[in-house]
Amino acid sequence: HPDNEGVQEPTLDDLLQRAARAKVVGIGETGLDYYRLGERSVADMEWQRTRYRTHIEAARRTDLPLVIHTRSASDDTLAILREAGGFKGDSASRPVARGVFHCFTETAEVARAALDLGFYIAFSGIITFKSAADLRAVVGFVPLDRLLIETDSPYLAPVPHRGKTNSPAYVPWVAKQVAEL
């Protein structure tokens, strides 16, 4: 997870070895999170960008999907994906453009860019929050065959369970909200 600064990060070789295990079905959660910069600048987040690039390369080499987290960092998140190449319409390199932007909280423009790169968009209990009207508008923009729902457990329980520990048992509230849109 992008918030795990200081955690010993596996090398690309480590990731490739781990990904070879039969139970491994994806690479991530990876991405960029600039939400809590505090006194630091975006330049101080180079460790996140380096880690993200390593995970993208692991996905490319293993042909596994990426699980991408982006928060207050969508421009860099998308730019690094594009730099990596191998995306939809790029026949010169092996496709890596599969995976999901999980717990999506960005704009319709970011959703369009992610969809154009071949990714799915997943929404969590946040879409049930009163304050998430803009995000609910994005839900309506995502094609149903590219839309996923999730818990992001143990966080972000949907209304009427907001503030409690989230659980997969609460996914029906997210599905209900999507259906109503």
Where do the language-model regions lie?
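Mid-domain alpha/beta scaffold segments of enzyme catalytic cores
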Residues: 1-181
